[in-house]
Amino acid sequence: MTPLYDFMSSPRQSLDMTMYELSDPTAEQILIADHKRGVRVRVLLDHDYSGGSVNQAAYATLSTAGVPVAWANDSEIFHQKTITVDGDESAIMTGNLTPQYYATTRDFVVMDSQAADVAAIESAFARDWSGAAPSPGPPGVDLVWSPGSEPQLAALIDSATRSVVVENEEMNSTAIEDALESDARRGVDVTVVMTADAEWDSAFSQLASDGVHVVLYPDTSSALYIHAKVIDVDSAKAFVGSENFSTASLDYNRELGLITSSASVLGPLNSALSADVSNGQPQQGASTSPPATATPPTSAPPPSSPTTIGCSPIDDEGGCYEPGEYCRNDDHGATGRAGDGQTITCEDENGTWYWEST
């Protein structure tokens, strides 16, 4: 999490945060420190899902320290996870600021410095900060807003010509499922990677019967938990964001993601997805041909067998010298280290990062 903490510590003028769940004391202290040194900090927290109980401690800590903090409109869930610094750059996240999950959960952060995107994010934040109910945000260049993102994400899946790799926490959107099944029937190599959940068994079976590779992780404390929300199309463009594949998330919640073709994002993203595909368990009844991988599988150990990994120094190919490396990035290189079961953080020279669990 160090790169994200560093980003949160970097503002000269302003920091705006919209967060579904905030329970990270380190993040809270950074926000307080920013406020004390004169940065305009505004923190918008979800209130609807739990009546504020999940975020109450963070709300109290920040407000006691004088940090401007507000509850989002409680007519819908504010599931967005975004941090914008100085109106120049935004961290668009699939995960919450909840430290108990950092080492065991698959999530991603993408940095967006596209001026039109950041301006759109700030415009939506200003409206949300005023207490308004969520509505589709300004489109920017690459942004995907909920409410109303289902057609945009289904169209992204439909655009595939070779492969689609998906990670998500939920599978309860007819439009998304139909798009995945349609791709598979027309010969696109489609892979869905999720944590096993009986709630989605019917969807998994239908996807598999239409030729989709369904790769599952057990819902146990020792296994990687798939919380990320990703659609990787042809290893050439990808959606990364907060949207789950459910009617509530796509059509009602406040959510934010983006679609990117940036090589600095796709490199580490494709590597992580490939590792997740190769380390998961294929669903019974799925197609017997090898599942799609965004790039050739990494040699990472399965999440159930943590390994101490050294990710410094970096070899000539931008990888780690250590065998079984999990901390991997594109040709910009990566830095990071982890002990058994701890989180590994990688960052490239363009400031794009992701984290993985051993």
Model segments located where?
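Secondary-structure "cap/kink" motif recognition
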Residues: 5-13, 149-162
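Short hydrophobic beta-strand segments
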Residues: 14-17, 142-143, 163-167
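PLD/PLD-like phosphodiesterase catalytic module centered on the HKD motif
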Residues: 27-90, 95, 99-104, 109-130, ...
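Post-signal/leader-peptide non-cytosolic segments of secretory proteins
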Residues: 295-358
